[in-house]
Amino acid sequence: QSAVSIQIKKLESTLGLQLIERNSKNFKLTFAGKELFKMSQDVFEKISRMENEMKKILQYKKGKISIGATHNIGEPVLPRIMVEFRKQYPEIEFDLYIKNKESLVKHLKEGTVDIALMEEYFIEDKEIKVIETEDYPFVVVAGKEITNLDELQNIPLLKRDTILTNKYLDLFEKIVGFNLDKRISVNGSIETMKNLIKDGLGFAILPYYSVHEEVERGALKLVHKFEKSEDRFQIVLIRENEDKEGISKFVEFLENYKINRDNAPLVTKVKKTKK
């Protein structure tokens, strides 16, 4: 018998429950075994978080926060957030991770990431706390050479396949009064889409937070700003960590941070040609 089998039998004897159904060829977990496995996963995740926290303290002699974000938030927004956070809290050190949503949740539970910023994402986990931020608007942006809405009929729509993009696309077609049949699907990041627009390959419907700097500089032209804002960020963290000093300060900073930048000057919207 292997050492593992011996330990499992000892555990079964201690609990008074059969954890594994055995036969000559294979085995499977009993109901009790499956429940114990689920609970043990939580224990291992907590141990992993503890080990990662101790490594940070050992390496930096003080607390250090690890901040994660999805690509669509991390590339256009996170650098600006961290510059302003550093001005307010220069003593707090941090690491940054740019991952997809699933990876961020995994790293949160393992303790390699303390806080994650992501688009709305359903998370059903009692250990995880989700804080909703302010709403932010979507806009239509094009290259700086565009002077009226009718010109959009001649260039492709660069389209991200998301529910909100499809919704705002339908609304925009009603506003301009013609169908946007020329389309290019783009599976890359928002930064990729912005570069394609700058190079004159099309226009796009994007969150305003991701393009407002280019609009201010005149690198992109604001074609239309939708009046209703209904999408938002999520600040995601492990509940047991929310009172740690560096984490609580960063969360408070994010809750007060104005992503929309409503006071930022906008380029005058282009008009639809009168007929």
Report each predicted region and the residues it spans:
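A short LG(V/I)-centered, amphipathic sequence patch enriched
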Residues: E12-F31
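Alpha-helical linker/hinge and terminal dimerization helices associated
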Residues: T14-L15, L36-L58
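Central regulatory/effector-binding core of bacterial HTH transcription factors
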Residues: K62-I123
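Hydrophobic hinge/microswitch elements
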Residues: N100-V105, K109-T112, F178-V223, E227-S229
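Flexible hinge/capping segments at coil-to-helix
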Residues: I128-N166
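Secondary-structure junction motif
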Residues: P156-N179, K244, V251, N260-V270
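A late-sequence structural motif
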Residues: V223-P265
